[in-house]
Swiss-Prot record:
Name of encoding gene: TCEA1
Protein's name in the database: Transcription elongation factor A protein 1
Source organism: Bos taurus (Bovine)
Residues annotated with Phosphoserine modification: 57, 81, 97, 100
Annotated GO biological process: positive regulation of transcription by RNA polymerase II; transcription elongation by RNA polymerase II
UniProt superkingdom: Eukaryota
Function: Necessary for efficient RNA polymerase II transcription elongation past template-encoded arresting sites. The arresting sites in DNA have the property of trapping a certain fraction of elongating RNA polymerases that pass through, resulting in locked ternary complexes. Cleavage of the nascent transcript by S-II allows the resumption of elongation from the new 3'-terminus.
Chain intervals with Basic and acidic residues compositional bias: 76-93
Modified residues (N-acetylmethionine): 1
Primary residence: nucleus
Molecular function (Gene Ontology), one example: DNA binding
Ranges where the TFIIS N-terminal domain occurs: 3-80
SUPFAM superfamilies: Conserved domain common to transcription factors TFIIS, elongin A, CRSP70 (SSF47676), Elongation factor TFIIS domain 2 (SSF46942), Zinc beta-ribbon (SSF57783)
Length: 301
């Protein structure tokens, strides 16, 4: 049964990626006939696939059946209720799914799952392991939340992942505000740097890690530019640092005095040079030159 659900989930994920939901209704009908369990929901993450289809489809029958399935599966996550007002709770699933102890316990107990859960209200299934961000009436903060959510929508990764980008954007903003406690320039610069890095086409993994919960909102709110940088940029910075250290060491080891080189700064020929094999053995050596008159340094291969 698990293999069957995984097969359906994979087909739905491909539909979302290709933005073509043809055949989604048949898959949803298959799911309706499968007796779902909590273990099956967690191991297959089918709820996220169904929710992604629901968000993308314009077919009313597809969205209606998807909502119905999600609503029935949410009851498995909530567990049996003994509250006398359970009927009222059912009318307000958005509130109970976020605040019930059962939902929070399930969120913290599934260590190998991401912070999203296969539970939903009529809007989405993404529920963070962090408390929902408190609402605010501050116009600056609201605008920043909107811009962060828009940055998280870059590349449409949030659809395939099934993340609630608006709630996630609010949580990131809330974490920034709680640290700075003001909406001054420091706050705005912090928000801008998050937005810039989330939109970076050369660093899609950062955005995906934030969306899927590998990087929690409060951690992302505090990350430095170096920590948010792409692997390519980190490697470049590492190499530049090594090069700077090597040049500094070369300057200390002395060298050979010569008048063969002309300083581009003071135009004099009183120089000292050192040759070092900085690349592979079959490539030319790098020559480091220091002007003994003005201290100007340069290198060439």
């Amino acid at each position: 049964m698990e293999d069957e659900v995984i097969r359906i989930a994979k087909k739905m994920d491909k539909m979302v990626q290709k933005k073509n939901a043809a055949g989604a209704l048949d898959l949803l009908k298959e799911l309706k006939n499968i007796p779902m369990t909590l273990e099956l929901l967690q191991s297959t993450r089918i709820g996220m696939s169904v929710n992604a289809i629901r968000k993308q489809s314009t077919d009313e029958e597809v969205t209606s059946l998807a909502k119905s399935l999600i609503k029935s599966w949410k009851k498995l996550l909530d567990g049996p209720s003994t509250d006398k007002d359970s009927e009222e709770k059912k009318k307000d699933t958005a509130v109970t799914s976020q605040n019930s102890p059962e939902a929070r316990e399930e969120s913290s107990s599934s260590g190998n799952m991401s912070s999203r859960k296969d539970e939903t209200n009529a809007r989405d299934t993404y529920v963070s392991s962090f408390p929902r961000a408190p609402s605010t009436s501050d116009s600056v903060r609201l605008k920043c939340r909107e811009m962060l959510a828009a940055a998280l929508r870059t590349g449409d990764d949030y659809i395939a992942i099934g993340a609630d980008e608006e709630e996630l954007g609010s949580q990131i903003e809330e974490a920034i505000y709680q640290e700075i406690r003001n909406t001054d320039m420091k706050y705005k610069n912090r928000v801008r740097s998050r937005i810039s890095n989330l939109k970076d086409a050369k660093n899609p993994n950062l955005r995906k890690n934030v969306l899927c919960g590998n990087i929690p909102p409060d951690l992302f709110a505090r990350m430095t530019a170096e920590e948010m940088a792409s692997d390519e940029l980190k490697e470049m910075r590492k190499n530049l640092t090594k090069e700077a250290i090597r040049e500094h060491q070369m300057a200390k080891t002395g060298g050979t005095q010569t008048d063969l080189f002309t300083c581009g700064k003071c135009k004099k020929k009183n120089c000292t040079y050192t040759q070092v094999q900085t690349r592979s053995a079959d490539e030319p050596m790098t020559t480091f030159v220091v002007c003994n008159e003005c201290g100007n340094r340069w290198k060439f291969c």
